[in-house]
Structures are given as C-alpha cells and as structure tokens.
Amino acid sequence: MAGDKGGGDGERRLRQPIVVVLGHVDHGKTTLLDKIRRTAVAAKEAGGITQHIGASIVPADVIEKIAEPLKKVIPVKLVIPGLLFIDTPGHELFSNLRRRGGSVADFAILVVDIMEGFKPQTYEALELLKERRVPFLIAANKIDRIPGWKPNPDAPFIETIRRQDPKVREILEQRVYEIVGKMYEAGLPAELFTRIKDFRRKIAIVPVSARTGEGIPELLAVLAGLTQTYLKERLRYAEGPAKGVVLEVKEMQGFGTVVDAVIYDGVLKKEDIIVVGGREGPIVTRVRALLMPAPLQDIRSREARFVQVDRVYAAAGVRIAAPGLDDVIAGSPIYAAESEEEARKLMEAVQREIEELRFRTENIGVVVKADTLGTLEALVEALRRRGVPVRLADIGPVSRSDVLDAAVTRKIDPYLGVVLAFNVKVLPEAEEEASRAGVKIFRESMIYKLIEDYEEWVKKEKEAERLKALNSLIRPGKFRILPGYVFRRSDPAIVGVEVLGGVIRPGYPVMDSQGRELGRIMAIKDRDRSLEEARLGAAVAVSIQGRILIGRHANEGDILYTNVPAQHAYKILTEFKDLVSKDELDVLREIAEIKRRAADHEYNKVLLRLKIKRVSQ
C-alpha cells in the first residue's frame, strides 16, 4: 500500500495538501525544493520523507520537528498527515496539474528573488494562480545575497534577522516593501508574515535562503498552518474511486507505456478500471501495476528502482502500468470506475472536457499547438486574457494543415495568421508550406516567452506598417539654397542645399516661403551617391524639375519647403505624430502658417478640424 490514509478507516480524514512551486527562471525554485527535501531527510529520526512518483511527502512529525524552535511564536500542531510537494517546479508542470474549473494543486509557493524582485514569469505565475484560484504564499528567496548578510545555516528567520546589522535589516525591509508594492499593483494585498493578523486577507511573504536553509522552518510552518486551517473541506479524504491527472507519459522497460499521475482524491487499486484522455478520444483500460519508488534513492536517476503496491491513497504521485496507454495525453484527467457502466459515463465526461480544450473554429485567430493538455489550456487562457482570438488549439507537432489554417487567417488579418508552437516539433512539410505561404511560426519551451515573442513581433510589424503608411505621405521638409552652389539654373535646376528641418525626398513637391509651388524634387545626391532622403543638417545637391528658374523664382540663400497637402498634414498630426521628430513637427507648423497666410482653403479646413478635435478632447 502507498499514500498515507491519515487515520482509522471509519473517520473523515484529511489528505496531504498538494503543493507546487512557481517563479521566474533562476529565482531558486529547484534549490528551494531540494533544500526542503534535504532538511526533511536531516530530521530523519522523526520519519524523513516519503518519495512518490514526481512528488515528495514531508510528514507532519517532520514539519513539527523542523518548526520546533518556533513553538512559542508559531505553535504548530498538525492534523494534516504532511505536505506533498510536486518535485518538478515551474509553470508548465503547474499547467498540467489541471482539473475542470481549477487546479489539482491545493497551495503554491511563489518564489521571488528578493534582490531582483518581480520578473516576467513572476507576473505569469500570478496570472496562472489567479486563473486557477490557487492560494499561495511568497518565498522571498536569496536573503543571503543581501550585502552584509551573516548566514546562520538552517536558522529560523526570526532568529537570523536579529543577528543582522541594522543596515542589512533596513535593506531587507525595503526589498519586502517592494514586493508588497508589486502585489498591490496586481490587486493582491501582501505583507511580511510576522505582521499578518488574518491570513485570509493578506498573502504571506516569508524571507528565506534556499542555499543556507534560513527561514525554511517558518516556510513549512506557515504553509502547513495555512493549508490545514483554511483548506480543511477541500482536503477531506474520500474513500471512493480515484480521481487524478496525468503528469507524464513515458516508456518503461518491462511495462511498455506507463503514465505518471497525481491522485488527488479517492483510492486507486491494482486491477481497477480507469478512464483517461487520449489523442483519439477517451481510453478505457485496467490497471496492471501501481509502481512507487524504492526508498533511499534519487528517483530522477535512470537507474531508479520501483516497487509494486496494491493501492494508493490520495494525495499521491504514482506510476501506472496498463494496456493501451500509448496515446494518453499529459494533462488529461484520469478516473477510476467501479463498473463498465460507470466507465461509459466517465468516457463521456472525459470527452467533453478534452473537446473544450482541443478545438477548431472557422473564426479568425491564431493557431496554437502544445505538447500537453495543461500547457495548451494555459496558453489559450493567456492569449484570451490578452485579447488574442484562437482559431485552432490542439496537441502534437505542427502539421501542414495547421499552417494552411493560419494562412486562411493571414489573408484577413496578417497579425493573427501565425502558428504558436509550444514545446512541439514542426514537421518538414509544415516548414515548406509556411515558407511558401509567408506564415510565421513561433517556437518556445516557456509559455511567457512564446507569448512575449509573438507580442513583440506584432508590435514591430504594426510599427513597420505605420511607418510604411507615413512614408507614403509627403512629409514636412525645409532647406536653404547654399550661396555659390547653383550648378544649373533650370530644367531641371540643380543646386546645393542645407536641410534645416524635417526630411526631403525625390518626388516631393517644393514651394517657396509664400506658398507658391516651384516644382518637384527629382533627385538627391551626396557627391556621386544617390540618396533616398536627406534630413536635418545634411548638405546635398538636389535637382528640381518645374517652372523654377534660379535668379527669378528663387535665389541663392532662399529657404524652400516641401509642399505638404492638407490631408497629409492632418494625417501626420492625428495618426503619426509619435513617429515624426520635433524638427519635422516644427517645419509642419511653419508650412501650416504659410498656407494660412496664403488663404489656402483646404489647410484652413484642416486647422479648424484640429482645433475642434482639441477642444472636444
């Protein structure tokens, strides 16, 4: 048998809370989990830890022993049998701990580097936790990195902080205050755990060092206390058939395809009928073996040994061997059934649940492919929060048909006609089709980075599109004919000029300071090199074709302007003002004043529209 039932068979028991660790890359998630395990092993005379598949149970008596120095400050008398920590930290694993309407995880530790503060994945973790309605505390990690910190290995935080210099305590206070501020901005009140009177109203911040072990006693004490106080109903153990979620699908010598699962409710027994989600629909099979790690070993090792058990009780991490598991999808629900009839009903429920996550519509939207149901759900949720519609969401490699779907969208909306591939391969024929159809494929193994890359691309594409639209207009330019640099007087006039503001380009019409049109710029040269444009400060030669005769219509030293049409001026001021330089705007104001004095009716209409717009704003 495996899993702690937590009491006699006749009573309503509490199971272990399932705890997951989240946070930004390199903020110390894995180190913290390792430290918790090592701290528990060090207290082995009280029972050590129980290793599960993908999880470790720290028993209640071990937590009480570790937290013993705090008994006067944080009295810890546990009624839960312990804490089940999911061994693999991170958002992708948390995403797979999914159940309909929430998460299998009962509680989370959000790890924040106290010196670095909030980072992109910290915000993503907050979004995920809010979306799945999972309570959490913050482990403000790496307190040993605070300048001047004097480490006290494995000491409680309330003891080690008293031994620090006032300046060090001041820095810690400041860093904690910054975390409180970021949480407030996210709409979540938080405070240092020692100052909280009602833990239902504020999220606890526990300063720790995963490296030295400082603060770990408080972290475990607060975590255990919070879960058993506020999650008691959720943690009530049910004796019925098991409910769980698939974390991983893998091959195992002697057993073929097996699944690693977390059982969060009920009992799973050898020979039970189980229903689990597959690529082509629900799979019904019978448990052949339940496998747990042999004690005193690192189960992450390839040589790890396993023992068979007859049953497991929630909460537990277990490896399940059964026929027909090849097509199981990670992140899918797994249910035990007491009869064939119940299995049929569960098949319908599993099918409905998977169809909600794997879908194809005729709507305009991005194509999303992911490796598991959990990451697919998390990715689609994250996109929807950002207002990005999804046309297709599915599991598995990117295929040619996925690219064709994106190509259909691209014709209508080029910013949505893309494929977002999370942790999956792109098939060669899909690569070829994407190249042919001009469909962009984004690939990443971190959800936040995948969305960030896509959003950055959209931003750049839209900026490029706006710049293209701006450059289709005649833009403001001001230049002076340099004395002594008249190379040809007319047809076309060729003169040396200095650009005094804005931009001049071939094709732009030219006017004088009275608003009279003189011709059109044919070419701009710097020595023998043709230029596409010249800006403020440039000294270049220009050729002007039209009714201009140097000496009659314009003279050496005269200032000329580009002749910006009224509608172009309006667009520049209303749509592209952020893309043009200050000197260009100054030149446009001069041009508008020249046009006003020349009684240009079109310009006067534009000026009136702009005035009305400013007043209405």
Swiss-Prot record:
Domain tr-type G: 14-231
G5: annotated segments: 209-211
Pfam family, one: GTP_EFTU_D2
Residues annotated for GTP binding in this entry: 23-30, 87-91, 141-144
GO molecular function, one term: GTP binding
GO cellular component, one term: cytoplasm
Domain of life: Archaea
Coiled-coil intervals, chain numbering: none
Function in brief: Function in general translation initiation by promoting the binding of the formylmethionine-tRNA to ribosomes. Seems to function along with eIF-2.
Name listed for the protein in its UniProt record: Probable translation initiation factor IF-2
Taxon lineage: Archaea, Thermoproteota, Thermoprotei, Desulfurococcales, Desulfurococcaceae
